C-alpha cells in the first residue's frame, strides 16, 4: 500500500501528483487501484463516489483591431464589436446533450477586458477568457478546432486578426466500474448506511493524472462549503 500527499493540486499542478506519475511510469511500477481523497460528498459522508471527471480547457482570446478616434470610425476597426460577436457565437453553441455518465458540456465566459482609459478612443485590442467543462464526447483538440474555425470566420469578415492561447487542465475520462469499485461502494454503505452514487460531476482533480497508470475512484470528505 502506498500513500501520496501532494501540496500542488490546484492550478497548473505541475510539481505534485503529475511528477510522481511520470516517475512511476519510468520505473514501470504497476498500481492495481487508487483511491483519490477528494471531497466528493455534497452534503453527507457516503453520498457519492467519483468514477470519472469532465475535461477542462481555458481559452484566452485577443482580437486585434485598429485604434482610432470615435469621431472617425471609418479610420478604425473596433475589436470590441468583433469580440462581442465571437463571444455570442461560442456561448450559443450546444456542444452536446450529455451522456449516460456525464452532464452536458458547458462553456462559460469568465473575463472580458478592454485596456482603454479614454472614453473617446476606439481600442486597438479586446481580450476575453472562457472555460469549457467537457464530457467524453469531446477532446481538447476537437474543441480547439471547432473554436478556431469560429474565430477565423468572424475575424476574417471583420478584417481583424486574433490570438488564442489554450490551457488544458485535463481531458474527460471515465473509469469503468469493476469489482473493486463495487467493493468500496458496499463498504461505504455498511459504515455510513448510505449507498454512494457513482458520479462524474464537479471540477478536475488529480485523478486525471492517476488514471493514466491505474484504475481509480475518488472518495473523501463533504465538500458542501466549497
Residue ranges, per PLM feature:
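Acidic-enriched catalytic cores of C-N bond-cleaving enzymes acting on peptides and small amides
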Residues: 70-113, 121, 136-162
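Short beta-strand/turn micro-motifs at beta-sheet edges
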Residues: 46-51, 115-121
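A structural signal for short, well-ordered beta-strand segments
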Residues: 3, 59-61, 109, 128-132
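Zn-dependent metallopeptidase/amidohydrolase metal-coordination segment
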Residues: 185-226
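A short beta-alpha structural unit
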Residues: 107-115, 131, 135, 161-181, ...
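Fold-level recognition of mixed alpha/beta catalytic cores in primary-metabolism enzymes, strongest
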Residues: 1-89
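Hydrophobic/aromatic beta-strand patches that form the interior of the parallel beta-sheet core
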Residues: 4, 35, 158, 215-219
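Short, flexible turn/loop "capping" segments at secondary-structure junctions
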Residues: 63, 120-126
Amino acid at each position: 500500500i502506498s500513500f501520496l500527499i501532494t501540496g500542488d493540486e490546484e492550478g497548473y499542478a505541475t510539481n505534485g501528483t503529475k511528477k510522481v506519475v511520470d516517475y512511476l511510469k519510468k520505473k514501470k511500477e504497476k498500481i492495481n487501484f487508487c483511491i483519490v481523497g477528494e471531497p466528493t460528498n455534497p452534503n453527507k459522508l457516503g453520498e457519492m463516489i467519483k468514477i470519472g471527471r469532465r475535461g477542462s480547457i481555458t481559452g484566452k482570446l485577443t482580437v486585434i483591431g485598429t485604434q482610432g478616434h470615435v469621431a472617425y470610425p471609418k479610420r478604425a476597426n473596433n475589436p470590441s464589436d468583433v469580440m462581442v460577436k465571437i463571444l455570442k457565437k461560442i456561448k450559443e453553441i450546444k456542444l452536446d446533450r450529455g451522456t449516460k455518465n456525464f452532464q452536458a458540456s458547458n462553456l462559460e465566459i469568465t473575463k472580458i477586458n478592454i485596456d482603454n482609459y479614454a472614453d473617446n478612443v476606439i481600442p486597438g485590442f479586446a481580450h476575453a477568457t472562457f472555460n469549457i467543462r467537457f464530457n467524453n464526447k469531446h477532446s481538447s483538440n476537437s474543441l480547439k478546432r471547432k473554436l478556431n474555425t469560429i474565430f477565423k470566420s468572424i475575424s476574417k469578415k471583420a478584417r481583424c486578426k486574433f490570438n488564442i492561447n489554450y490551457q488544458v487542465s485535463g481531458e474527460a475520462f471515465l473509469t469503468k466500474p469493476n469489482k473493486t469499485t463495487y467493493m468500496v461502494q458496499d463498504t461505504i454503505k455498511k459504515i455510513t448506511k448510505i449507498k454512494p452514487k457513482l458520479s462524474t460531476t464537479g471540477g478536475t482533480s488529480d485523478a486525471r493524472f492517476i488514471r493514466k497508470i491505474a484504475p481509480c475512484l475518488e472518495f473523501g470528505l463533504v465538500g458542501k462549503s466549497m
